[in-house]
Amino acid sequence: MQWQDHAIILGVKRLGETSVIAEVMTRDRGRHMGLVRSGRSRSMQPVLQPGNLVEVTWRARLHEHLGEFRMEPVRLRAARLMETATAVYGVQAMGALLRLLPERDPHPYLYDALDVILENMQNPMDAGELFVRFELAVLNELGYGLDLGECAATGVRDDLAFVSPKTGRAVCRTAGAPWADKMLALPPFLAAGTVEAANGESLAAAFRLTGFFLHRHVYEPRGIEIAAAREGFIQAALKAVNAVSLDRPDNPPVIAAKR
């Protein structure tokens, strides 16, 4: 059996003295593993870095076998991704999110989103918002998508301010006010129909929102912890926002975001 596809490197594991098992995210075949012979060679090590885009050919005798990868570089961006803390942690955290999905299960939307985010991860001001939207997309692909398009109580699409922790649906400010202390805040930049950019406060609220539902629907039922790289990314992203906020008195810095 054989197929060919574009793939993004997620990670590698050493196998013997010269080979590695590579983990990649492909567009048409999802997250996939394969043996790379001579993967530890001087020529292949720069190619097999997380975040790089490659053209991969997979061969195996049977579909269920691990199989062997042959790789050709398409876009080597790992060196650039290592220049900022947000990018370093972001690549690791997004890889951990993709490992929540079944292996070899196609998720073309997530592949495309990952590729776009990696191209823009070097800008810390964009990285936080893109990462939050990626977490929302993963929740949706796992069957736990949030409905942020209209108020669950009234059906209106304006002034959406809360998210119900029970249903994952948006609630407008008027309808949610009596239960505001029990609701999750809906950051304005995530509300349907808005074009507002994220700032420190709204970004911290967004991390709390996605973290809550990831923990409730995914990590807690599976008995696993949220990847440490996520917290590293959050701190790096908020630090970058805080640095910009020092020059903008109307945007007070935000110190941390907790689940």
Curated annotation (Swiss-Prot):
PANTHER family, per the entry: DNA REPAIR PROTEIN RECO (PTHR33991:SF1)
SUPFAM superfamilies per record: ArfGap/RecO-like zinc finger (SSF57863), Nucleic acid-binding proteins (SSF50249)
Swiss-Prot/TrEMBL keywords: DNA damage, DNA recombination, DNA repair
Name of the featured protein: DNA repair protein RecO
Signal peptide: none
Entries under Gene3D superfamilies matching the protein: Nucleic acid-binding proteins (2.40.50.140), Recombination protein O, C-terminal domain (1.20.1440.120)
Single GO BP term: DNA recombination
Calcium recorded as keyword: no
DNA damage recorded as keyword: yes
GO CC annotations on file: bacterial nucleoid
Family: Belongs to the RecO family.
Task performed by this protein: Involved in DNA repair and RecF pathway recombination.
